[in-house]
Amino acid sequence: MRRQPPFTAVALLVLVLPVAAADPPEAEQARAVAGQVLERTKAVLQSALRDGQPAAALRVCASVAQGIAREHEQQGWRVRRVSDRVRNPADTPDAYEREVLRTWQEEKSAGRLAPTTERQEIVTEGGQSALRYMRPILIAAPVCLQCHGEPAKLGPGVAEALRELYPGDQATGYSLGDLRGAISVRIPLGASR
């Protein structure tokens, strides 16, 4: 048996590893959807807040994110915002999402969590493979605190709107830079995986 020189083995690893580490196409789709949720929500919120309507922004924020989720439900995808301090009970994280949020909170506390952080992996749930993708939502600007800041400092009409729309709201008391939650995308994968 002929023995390969060590540099040949290293060269093969260098060529093979990038292919093995490449994202599945569903990961790029999930990344794009998460970006849509963040960008569309941000644009609509900025418009409502520019008009001096932080209480109206609460309704808009929910409707935009839910609209994007509905667009992808037909494909069997689940797209949602989750948090360990929910405003809408439908945004309560599942076990996978809770673990990612816990890990990110630790990273945030250590100063290692960036807005561009993401987590993706293929998991098996209920006998079916799925791509799980998450991207953090941070309290990135002072304007976020109009709806998510200290209760005594919320924007005009926000406390009243929260009591009406979300009587069990837990999503206040944040400070600038805090981890608010995450965009979570779950895409079922074909039987071939």
Where do the PLM segments sit?
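N-terminal secretory signal peptides that target proteins for export/translocation
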Residues: 1-4
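Short Cys/His-rich local motifs and their 1-3 flanking residues in nucleic-acid-associated proteins
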Residues: 149
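Composition- and surface-driven signal marking solvent-exposed, interaction-prone regions
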Residues: 6-9, 160
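Short, cysteine/histidine-rich loop/knuckle motifs that typically chelate Zn2+
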Residues: 146
